[in-house]
């Protein structure tokens, strides 16, 4: 049987395992766990810490947003198939599990004293902390987009929320016969199939509503990095003449005023330019002192999701240095949350994290 250690450390393959039961839960566990980030990883960890401890562990979730907006399926909003309200939920479900939810920003973390400083609501002491801050963008790689004014014109919409709606409006306002271009950074990045999905859905929108319009995919990678067969078949069978895919097209910068993508050997002017910048772990991970690979992604012990160099600090989701074949996805963040919850409960009980399958 493939055990959890072998799976997480060796394969990391999504879709071949379900981490379902309480492998590490223990009613002997006590203490206070602070979870920062209420996305798929953090919210899952908070819930299962309460569930698997039978309520004996105190859990506080710190999340700046008052509602959760799902990044997975947000492309449906961009394509006009759903509204932002359709993919938005409250945090009341976590409160029902006994999770204390605080809406605030983290401004500092002292991992030696095990204290987290909030912008408005003082400090939180913790026995163990979970960071699940998602991604931040490497704006220095796209110099023209370093300022907020430029970012409001050339959108990423890779964090679901206002930019999701704004990108939809840009597409609606674009004249029929215009061109939408999507730039994709070199992997790894959040949600490997997501850009190709977005391009395909916008191609469908154009085909049905703006048939003279075009989709141009400028991919820094040498080929489609996820689900290639499915996407290429769709582009050939359904969107031939509507969608053009260009590999090895790495973005160097942007001419914001003229909506132009500046590539190494070309400049591409379009009507709607959608730039996905290179990405790294959320800034809080670096601020915590956690070891980063290539100054980008957190190195962790996959058995416990604990930082390799900061004890008591567990890091989840897109911020981690992914194992081979493990995508940065909501599904995997959910699994990370369960693995971390089980391991933390073992550790708070004075036990080692379980190596048994979950």
Question: Which functions belong to the PLM regions below?
Answer:
Residues 96-109, 113-116, 124, 204-296, ...:
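A Rossmann-like FAD-binding core segment of flavoenzymes
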Residues 133-209:
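Glycine-rich dinucleotide-binding loop and its adjacent helix/turn
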Residues 333-357:
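Internal hydrophobic alpha-helix adjacent to the cofactor/substrate pocket in enzyme cavities
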Residues 25-100, 186-227:
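Beta1-alpha1 glycine-rich phosphate/pyrophosphate-binding loop at the start
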Residues 1-14, 19:
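N-terminal secretory signal peptides and thylakoid transit peptides that target proteins
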Residues 11, 133-134, 277-278:
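Glycine-rich, N-terminal phosphate-binding loop of Rossmann-like dinucleotide-binding domains
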Residues 147-174, 269-272, 276-334, 346:
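FAD-site-proximal beta/loop scaffold in flavoenzymes
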């Amino acid at each position: 049987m493939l055990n959890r250690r072998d799976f997480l450390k060796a394969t990391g393959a999504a879709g071949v395992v379900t981490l379902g039961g309480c492998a590490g839960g223990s009613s002997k566990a006590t203490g206070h766990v602070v979870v920062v980030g209420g996305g798929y990883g953090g919210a899952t960890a908070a819930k299962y810490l309460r569930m698997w401890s039978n309520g004996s562990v105190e859990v506080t979730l710190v999340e700046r947003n008052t509602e959760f907006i799902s990044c997975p399926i947000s492309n449906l909003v961009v394509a006009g198939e759903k509204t932002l309200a359709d993919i938005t939920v409250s945090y009341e479900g976590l409160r029902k599990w006994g999770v204390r939810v605080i809406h605030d920003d983290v401004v500092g973390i002292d991992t030696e004293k095990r204290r987290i400083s909030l912008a408005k609501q003082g400090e939180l002491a913790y026995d163990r902390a979970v960071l699940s801050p998602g991604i931040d963008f490497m704006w220095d790689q796209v110099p023209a987009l370093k300022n907020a004014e430029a970012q409001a014109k050339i959108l990423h919409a890779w964090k679901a929320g206002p930019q999701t709606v704004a990108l939809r409006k840009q597409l609606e306002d674009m004249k029929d016969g215009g061109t939408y271009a999507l730039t994709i950074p070199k992997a790894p990045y959040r949600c490997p199939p997501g850009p190709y999905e977005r391009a395909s859905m916008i191609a469908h929108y154009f085909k049905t509503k703006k048939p003279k319009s075009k989709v141009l995919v400028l991919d820094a990678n040498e080929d489609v990095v996820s689900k290639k067969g499915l996407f290429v078949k769709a582009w050939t069978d359904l969107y031939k003449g509507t969608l053009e895919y260009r590999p090895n097209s790495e973005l160097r910068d942007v001419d914001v005023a003229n909506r132009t993508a500046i590539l190494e050997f070309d400049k591409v002017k379009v009507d709607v330019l959608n730039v996905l910048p290179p990405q790294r772990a959320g800034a809080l991970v670096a601020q915590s002192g956690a070891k980063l690979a290539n100054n980008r992604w957190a190195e962790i012990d996959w058995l416990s999701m604990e930082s390799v160099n900061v004890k008591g600090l567990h890091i989840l989701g897109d911020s981690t240095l992914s194992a081979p074949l493990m995508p940065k996805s909501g599904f995997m963040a959910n699994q990370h949350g369960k693995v971390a919850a089980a391991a933390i409960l073992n550790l708070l009980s004075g036990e080692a994290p379980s190596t048994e399958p979950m």
